Amino acid sequence: TCLHNKRRNDFDAYGESWLESVVRTKDNLNYNSVYIPYQFPPSYNAYRGGVPTKETEECLKYVLALAKICTPEDMYIDYAYFYPFELDEADIDEVNNRAANAERMLSEGGDVDQMLALAVERLKSDDEFAALREKYGDEFADRVLDSILKIPTLFTNVNFMGDWVDNYTADFCPYLSVFGSGRVTEHYASEAEKKNSEVWAYTCVGPVYPYPTFHIDDYNLGTRISGWMEKCYGIDGYLYWASTNGHNSLEWYKYVNQYEDSTRYVGADGDGYLVYPGKYYGSDTPLPSLRLV
């Protein structure tokens, strides 16, 4: 895809077309992640009254389907991750009790961990997976089951939240600017090592200059050195929100002319999109922004 070729892994497929998209892009040299396209609602519970909720059953469809197309050569489940953006920036945004929901869902043994444990139990008694075990062996099958339990859940924060880092099983994804302190960087790294997890970073409306951004009004130097900074700080992944947004945040119901209106979020022109519609100029593929150079 256009974004893969620019070293960006996007997610744009849902439902039945999702697995097809995963398989189709696996041979791209820049392929490195598989977004599981289930969005946890703010009130998500793995169980209710001792019975898996309908939300859990819906999420399991994706997890189990991905696990059952794995082979020793193509371990798709190793690339999988969740991104529950209903929990975004829970440290500053109390919409829908985000902080409380994050604690319930992401604490060790919380609702996400319970859902993944159920996925493993379902696979163990699944006939298709039993056939994979017979074909590829116990070592392969056990690796798939272990990988399911380790599927990361990205959790974005604006600030360093030490208690959360210590007690949640999420893969933390704070603002890139948080890593300016050696103490903070070491804390993230230490906890990630203990939990066999990763540390990500992200940028969106913030942080702003002098931190590197993908904003149109920033120097292009920023887009180039952000990767260097991530390497320096030992950051494993980078999240950008978002790459194909066609709405102004003040009018979500209304598309904008993307060649005339640079604003998706006030005060951060360029945030929310990294490509332009190619059809406008007769192209069947999106046209990448110079910010992707």
Predicted feature locations:
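Generic beta-sheet signal
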Residues: 156, 175, 202-204, 240-241
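Active-site clefts of carbohydrate-active enzymes
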Residues: 195-223
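Aromatic-lined carbohydrate-binding surfaces of glycoside hydrolases
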Residues: 1-169, 207, 247
